[in-house]
Amino acid sequence: MKAIRMRALVRGFTVIGACSTALAPSGCGLFGPSAEHFLIPVDSIAVPSIVAATDTLTARFYGGIGPDGCWRLARVDKQVTSASLDVTFHGEHQVRSGYACTASPVALNYAEVLKPPLGTPFAITVHQPDGSLLRRLATVQ
């Protein structure tokens, strides 16, 4: 009886080991694809230098997210006041088993529209992955 229990236990460990070995190289966890999270670097902010006090202000953000279609913009953290916009872009790299990524690089092309009233100067700040800040100012007249 003890021998039968021992064989069943060994077979159970063998099945568990085989399943986890099969999942490891595929890049998948037990509950689906794994994802790597990162901050997206912003190359430039396009914003008019002067804005009328009654106009909306459109700030455009450009940069590179990743080398292929498995990279994406996951979320945008922003804090808006009457005098500033503070932004951090978060990306995600998805690793999926048996999934081919498109070969095209993924670019950041994001616009934020801000409605009046706006303070002057209006400061737009982006938090970069290396800890630095990218900042642009717009004069509101």
Identify the residue ranges that each predicted region occupies.
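Short, surface-exposed binding/anchoring microloops in extracellular/periplasmic proteins
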Residues: 42, 47-79
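Bacterial Sec-dependent N-terminal signal peptides
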Residues: 19-44
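Short, aliphatic-rich beta-strand segments
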Residues: 61, 83-92
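Short beta-strand edge segments in extracellular beta-sheet folds
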Residues: 139-141
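Short, exposed beta-strand-loop hairpins at the edges of beta-sheets
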Residues: 113-117, 123-137
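An anionic, turn-rich surface loop/hairpin at beta-sheet edges
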Residues: 89-116
